[in-house]
Design a protein with these regions (language model features):
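Functionally critical loop-and-helix segments that line ligand-binding/catalytic clefts
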Residues: 1-43
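Lectin-type carbohydrate-recognition ectodomains
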Residues: 40-189
């Protein structure tokens, strides 16, 4: 709506007259057609949200959830620098994410694919009191996508290289080190 002042005169009103202009397509409204056909047609290629991993770690307590690799409070990682991780839980917005961990001076624990902060058998990879020194993630049934992940170990502020799939793992299995931070990302193949 646009308002302006006219210098013209209107009978019965002294001085300038304020007029309101409203840009409405009244002929279309009168004919019953209020929008164009283009406006009624949905977009041909709506943008789908990018797939994301959601994950948490247990360091004596469950830390906050990281989702989509962009939690501003954690710079996109789960963990606390120089504090060991004992458990990991993770899920993906597409496909099925399975994962497992290696415990220091121990072995690879079984694969899990649930997402839980209470089920240490099906929804958490890890074991209470057992420090994690290696992790593996695998994304199943997600055509065109895979999981990429990396870890940081105690004694360094840097991350180890990114790992894709299960041909390798993130961490260092040597009996001395432990993982203190992880990052997980769902990416196109």
């Amino acid at each position: 709506m646009w308002q302006y002042s006219s210098s013209g005169k209107v009978d019965g009103i002294s001085g300038n007259v304020d007029l309101d202009w409203c840009y409405v397509d009244y002929p279309s409204i009168i004919k019953g057609k209020t929008t164009t056909e283009e406006e009624k047609t949905p977009p041909q290629n709506p943008t789908a949200p990018a797939p994301k991993a959601t994950y948490r770690v247990y360091t004596g307590k469950w830390l906050g959830e990281i989702s989509g690799y962009n939690n501003i409070n954690s710079n996109g990682y789960a963990g606390i620098e120089q504090k060991p991780i004992y458990g990991v839980t993770a899920k993906s917005s597409i496909g099925k994410l399975r994962y497992r961990v290696h415990t220091r001076n121990g072995r690879w624990l079984p694969w899990v694919s649930g997402y839980s902060t209470s089920d240490w058998n099906k929804g958490i990879a890890g074991s209470l009191g057992k420090i994690i020194d290696g992790v593996q993630f695998d994304l199943l049934n997600a055509n065109g996508y895979t999981v990429k992940y990396r870890a940081s170990i105690n004694g360094t502020k840097n991350y180890l290289p990114w790992v894709t799939g299960t041909k390798d793992f993130a961490g260092i299995i040597n009996g001395r080190n432990f993982i203190d931070k992880i990052q997980i990302e769902i990416v196109k193949k």
